[in-house]
């Protein structure tokens, strides 16, 4: 029934529009074609001016109403550079937008058809063509220059002392791996992936560098004011590491590692105070449609001080010991203390 009413309303609207158009034709015939055209031009010229004024007011109003919806201050040093590029682009294109739109609609109103003047047609003008070629070229050169300057800073090599974290996307979640004290991520092989044997990352246990690697899911911890280099990959389909608060994103491609680096500027607690949101968290999202569960690929990033990070890391057990409990010294120690008690009981 609802579909029927929608179709009926659309049909009625079409008929009304058609009848108005036909009535306008009859009026034009009665009043004379030339007089009708001039009157129509005058009305359209006035409406264009109204559209310009209402449009500019609308642009201002929308910006005022929606400015609280933006992400706010960037939380990384690279984010500052990216926002700066955005502001430069908006400034240049904004000047062009307002200048051209105001001129376009004002000229349409001012130079509407009139019996007092006749249109002059410009077949060619070298000076005019030079102006509208040189000015856009200069503007684009400025944009490209700033873009390349900041781009090389953002995509350059990470500092040698940068913290390293492996980020792997899967349907539908995130996995993180931290190198241990050796600061080297161990080797892995996709055929070794076996969550049932506590080896979800496919680590090669024969590689000593894997013996102290820490494995995590859905939550990544970073240190404030310390550069971090992300080594990014995927298990199944293409994902995309989206770090909106840090103004960064990078594709996660199966079999082809990608990297990016940045330096967090504020801890999670500091950003919560800045935003006035006590429950604020940094998020990692998948910015590439990856399947039916794409919406659920939300991870959490905790930015904290070095002391807090060290305490958190100290409480984590290397995945090698989780997968090979017989190699865990703490378990052996517990067993050794229990055996004499068993002997005494006997």
Which residues make up each language-model segment?
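Transmembrane alpha-helices
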Residues: 1-66
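Non-transmembrane, membrane-proximal soluble domains of secreted or membrane proteins
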Residues: 33-39, 55-88, 101-346
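Alpha-helical transmembrane segments
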Residues: 1-12, 82-99
């Amino acid at each position: 029934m609802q579909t029927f009413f929608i179709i009926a309303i659309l049909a009625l609207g079409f008929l009304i529009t058609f009848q108005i158009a036909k009535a306008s034709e009859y009026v034009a015939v009665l009043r004379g074609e030339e007089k009708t055209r001039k009157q129509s031009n005058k009305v359209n010229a006035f409406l264009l001016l109204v559209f310009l004024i209402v449009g500019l007011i609308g642009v201002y109003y929308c910006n005022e109403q929606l400015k609280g919806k933006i992400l706010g201050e960037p939380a990384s040093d690279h984010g500052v550079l990216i926002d700066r590029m955005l502001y430069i682009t908006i400034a240049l294109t904004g000047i062009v937008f307002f200048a051209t739109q105001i001129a376009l609609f004002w000229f349409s109103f001012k130079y509407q058809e009139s019996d007092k003047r006749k249109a002059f047609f410009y077949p060619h003008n070298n000076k005019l063509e030079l102006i509208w070629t040189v000015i856009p070229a200069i503007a684009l050169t400025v944009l490209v220059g700033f873009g390349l300057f900041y781009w090389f800073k953002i995509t350059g090599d990470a500092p040698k002392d940068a913290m390293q974290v492996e980020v792997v996307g899967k349907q539908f979640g995130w996995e993180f791996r931290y190198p241990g004290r050796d600061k080297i991520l161990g080797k892995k092989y996709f055929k070794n992936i076996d969550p049932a044997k506590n080896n979800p990352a496919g680590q090669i246990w024969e590689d000593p560098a894997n013996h102290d690697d820490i494995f995590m899911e859905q939550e990544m911890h970073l240190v404030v004011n310390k550069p971090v280099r992300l080594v990014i990959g995927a298990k199944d389909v293409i994902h995309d590491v989206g770090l909106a608060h840090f103004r960064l994103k990078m594709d996660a491609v199966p079999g082809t590692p990608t990297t990016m680096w940045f330096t967090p500027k504020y801890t999670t607690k500091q950003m919560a105070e800045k935003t006035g949101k006590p429950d604020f968290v940094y998020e990692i999202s998948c910015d590439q449609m990856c399947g039916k569960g794409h919406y659920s690929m939300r991870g959490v990033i905790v930015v904290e001080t070095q002391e807090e990070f060290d305490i958190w890391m100290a409480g984590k057990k290397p995945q090698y010991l989780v997968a090979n409990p017989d190699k865990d010294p703490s378990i052996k120690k517990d067993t050794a203390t229990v055996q004499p008690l068993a002997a005494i009981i006997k």
